[in-house]
Curated annotation (Swiss-Prot):
It comes from Ruthia magnifica subsp. Calyptogena magnifica. HAMAP family: Trp_synth_alpha. This is Tryptophan synthase alpha chain. PANTHER family: TRYPTOPHAN SYNTHASE ALPHA CHAIN, CHLOROPLASTIC (PTHR43406:SF1), TRYPTOPHAN SYNTHASE, ALPHA CHAIN (PTHR43406). Tetramer of two alpha and two beta chains.
Length: 265
């Protein structure tokens, strides 16, 4: 059983998986490593690491700027894999999902990337700009090394697309609870509930809900219907706000992570 499967299946009834997102290398790779430790201490079950990219079209302003800062510091895919390998020296229970764009993976080569990700003990990969219909080659390479290929589902996703995702997705489904980019507003929990029922009829995987979760109240509301709660923009905002004060950065990220985790467990 994969690390992701273990996390989702062994959680006590009524408790939900907490998945925080941070961009690798934003404020420095050493800081990212410390942030990962803090997130684990404050309830993270899975950590999504953003792989820096020069044109993060699916991300809102907060996360897009974090990509810009990390790219400006020269952080790339190889650095992220090295970071995960370092993390694994002291943690073999928290799952790590790489979330990024297709170009760096294509440049690396699908099989070479899959092998390197496996060597670093990455658990899942989410490529935000790869259409599922074009994912077979990457899927095959990741399957060879038992790494899950995770896909996004939106309010606008058709039944036809959901049926196809049921044949190719693994790990969990990342449900975008809003129309727009990361960091958007106006979370409609009733709409999320209704759509998740539709997704569950077609895809037999855990569902994590992201976008629009701003506090413990919204996290708790979503967790009634989701298997996991995903939070990113607010954590990344703390990294930017306290870029020159590491202790405050770690403290604020830790406090917020604990608040969300406590609300859903």
């Amino acid at each position: 059983m994969s690390r992701l499967s273990t996390i989702f299946t062994q959680l006590p009834v009524g408790k939900k998986v907490f998945i925080p997102f941070i961009t690798a290398g934003d404020s420095g790779l050493d800081n990212t490593f410390e942030l990962m430790q803090v997130l684990v201490k404050n309830g993270a079950d899975v950590i999504e690491l953003g792989v820096p990219f020069s044109d993060p079209i699916a991300d809102g302003p907060i996360i897009a700027k974090s990509h810009e800062r990390a790219v400006a510091d020269g952080v790339g895919l190889c650095d992220v894999l090295s970071l995960v390998k370092k993390f694994r020296q002291s943690n073999d229970t928290t799952a790590i999902v790489l979330m990024g764009y297709l170009n760096p993976i294509e440049a690396f080569g699908y099989q070479a990337f899959a092998n390197a990700a496996s060597e670093s003990a990455v658990d899942g990969v989410l490529v935000v700009d790869m259409p599922p219909e074009e994912a077979h080659d990457l899927k095959r390479s990741l399957d060879d090394v038992n790494i899950d290929l995770i896909f996004l589902v939106a309010l606008t996703t058709t039944d036809e697309r959901l049926a196809f995702l049921a044949t190719i997705a693994s790990g969990f489904i990342y449900f975008i609870s809003l129309k727009g980019v990361t960091g958007a507003e106006h979370l409609d929990v009733d709409l999320v509930k209704m759509y998740l029922l539709r997704v569950r009829k077609m895809i037999n995987l855990p569902i994590g809900v992201g976008f629009g979760i701003k506090n413990a109240k919204s996290a708790k509301a979503v967790s009634k219907y989701a298997d996991a709660v995903i939070v990113g923009s607010l954590l990344v905002a703390f990294v930017e706000q306290y870029a020159n004060d590491r202790n405050k950065m770690l403290a604020n990220v830790g406090y917020f992570a604990d608040e969300i985790s406590t609300a859903i467990k």
